[in-house]
């Protein structure tokens, strides 16, 4: 598989977002994950109970794959997920819990897998890895042990939080070009504005804070 840097992934995001804007006829106040996934890669979503522990948030496959995954449940039943490259399953608890930020990140994350698979079909070989699970972690841990997930997480952040939208809301909320101290106790005013910014963008505060550092 290709080893892509943050700069590489940002350049990819710029091309993809430009394409998305040409397909949309409205002002962008935030990236709509469902609309984005459908327009860019024809991906649709279905909600399901992904795991008993909540450790798996999403499941999808690259294009040209047709398979069914059977997952044993605690009550002795078996749940089947049919994958064909056009559907991604998302953990139902994300919607039930009202966690909009984590839900949106997961939706774009699944689309980002498809985008990388389309750009690098030989490297992201479906026969070698026919399906992909998204684990419950928005952070990019170091040292990197899973380049597929690291690259997908970074691309997701660039797609969901383009620099233009960040700069726009930083200006509108009076945060300037940089938040020097992000702390709920020692900088409550800035933290409240930062929280409002995350709400407007439809992301978690964790995802936004990571994006602001990169």
What positions do the PLM features span?
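Active-site hotspot residues in diverse enzymes, especially metal/ion-binding acidic/histidine motifs
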Residues: 1-214
């Amino acid at each position: 598989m290709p080893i892509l840097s943050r700069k590489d992934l940002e350049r990819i995001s710029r091309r993809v977002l430009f394409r998305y804007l040409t397909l949309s006829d409205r002002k962008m106040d935030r990236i709509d994950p469902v609309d984005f996934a459908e327009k860019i890669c024809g991906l649709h979503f279905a909600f399901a109970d992904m795991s008993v522990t909540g450790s798996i948030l999403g499941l999808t496959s690259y294009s040209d794959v047709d398979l069914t995954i059977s997952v044993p449940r605690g009550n002795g039943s078996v749940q089947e997920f049919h994958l064909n490259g056009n559907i991604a399953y998302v953990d139902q608890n994300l919607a039930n819990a009202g966690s909009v930020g984590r839900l949106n990140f997961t939706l774009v994350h699944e689309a980002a897998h498809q985008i990388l698979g389309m750009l690098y079909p030989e490297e992201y070989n479906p026969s070698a890895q026919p399906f992909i699970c998204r684990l419950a972690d928005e952070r990019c841990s170091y040292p990197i042990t899973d380049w597929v997930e690291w690259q997908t997480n970074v691309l997701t952040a660039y797609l969901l939080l383009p620099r233009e939208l960040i700069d726009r809301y930083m200006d509108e909320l009076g945060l300037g070009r940089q938040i020097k101290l992000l702390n709920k106790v020692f900088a409550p005013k800035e933290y409240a504005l930062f929280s409002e910014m995350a709400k407007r963008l439809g992301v978690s505060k964790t995802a936004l804070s990571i994006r602001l550092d990169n």
